[in-house]
């Protein structure tokens, strides 16, 4: 496993891009209307393609896909081929990954002009990425990315407010985060980059009595975000935008 830390250059890039964002999408509502499956956000003559995978949304969550608005606007402005894979987040990530792999292979076949693919899964979308890469053939043109994604779950140390829902999901999905130990120790055939937050600054995990990021995946690259960049807290949602900036630049 290789560890990297971000430099102040990323902070400067972030400051500039916040000021000059292209507003193709003004609201999460536009993304919410997109059907499940693989959808085109933007196409261009670029040789790079970004494939986005969203995470889990609780029943009470209003701003579904809000975290993707700013990254998508940035990618569109910079003429990057961008695709969005949507799915039913109540399904098991392992099952979702099976469909995703079919869709990804079809997408690659349809866009032979793209010679570098970046698959980016945020939060539970990163779990889908892990199951995807687990069952993927080697392809040197694909880099898999997990952003703000837990690598293991100690259910007994999760706050009671969320413990029951996690227990139900794990009972429903025997192939879950805690199924990867053997795979993590061996590593994956394809390149994997983990974009990790500091647990105490991640709204999703800060109340956990353990660090869900604290797990080694052999031969993966780890990018550890600081607690803030240019005064902007790097949290569970904002880390997605920072990761996209670094991937593109």
Where are these regions (language model features)?
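Classical Sec-dependent N-terminal signal peptides that target proteins to the secretory pathway
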Residues: 2-22
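Active-site catalytic motif of lipid deacylating hydrolases and related acyltransferases
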Residues: 21-115
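Glycine-rich, phosphate-binding/catalytic loops in enzymes
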Residues: 67-71, 136-138, 161-164, 211-213
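Short aromatic-enriched loop/helix-cap "lid" or pocket-rim segments at secondary-structure transitions
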Residues: 64-65, 153-160, 203-209
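C-terminal catalytic-base region of ester-bond hydrolases, centering on the histidine
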Residues: 167-171, 175-249
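Hydrophobic/aromatic beta-strand patches that form the interior of the parallel beta-sheet core
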Residues: 51, 83, 145, 193-196
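Active-site loop/turn elements of alpha/beta-hydrolase fold enzymes
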Residues: 85-89, 149, 197
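Serine-dependent carboxylesterase/thioesterase catalytic core
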Residues: 58, 97-189
């Amino acid at each position: 496993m290789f560890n990297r830390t971000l430099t102040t250059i990323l902070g400067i890039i972030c400051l500039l891009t916040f000021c000059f964002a292209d507003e193709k999408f003004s609201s999460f509502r536009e993304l919410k209307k997109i059907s499940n499956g693989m959808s085109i956000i933007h196409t261009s003559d670029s040789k790079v393609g970004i494939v986005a995978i969203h995470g889990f949304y609780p029943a009470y969550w209003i701003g579904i896909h809000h975290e993707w608005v700013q990254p998508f606007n940035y990618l569109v402005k910079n003429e990057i081929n961008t695709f969005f894979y949507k799915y039913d987040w109540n399904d098991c990530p392992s099952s979702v990954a099976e469909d995703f792999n079919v869709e990804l292979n079809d997408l690659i076949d349809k866009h032979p002009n793209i010679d570098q693919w970046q698959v980016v899964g945020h939060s539970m979308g990163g779990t889908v990425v892990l199951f995807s890469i687990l069952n993927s053939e080697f392809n040197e043109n694909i880099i898999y990315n997990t952003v703000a994604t837990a690598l293991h779950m100690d259910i007994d140390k999760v706050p009671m407010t969320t413990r029951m829902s996690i227990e139900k999901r794990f009972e429903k999905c025997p192939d879950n985060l805690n199924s990867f130990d053997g795979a993590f120790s061996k590593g994956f055939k394809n390149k994997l980059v983990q974009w990790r937050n500091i647990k105490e600054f991640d709204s999703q995990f800060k109340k956990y009595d353990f660090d869900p990021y604290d797990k080694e995946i052999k031969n993966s690259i780890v990018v550890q975000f600081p607690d803030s960049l240019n005064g902007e807290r790097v949290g569970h949602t904002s880390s997605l935008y920072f990761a996209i900036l670094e991937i593109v630049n």
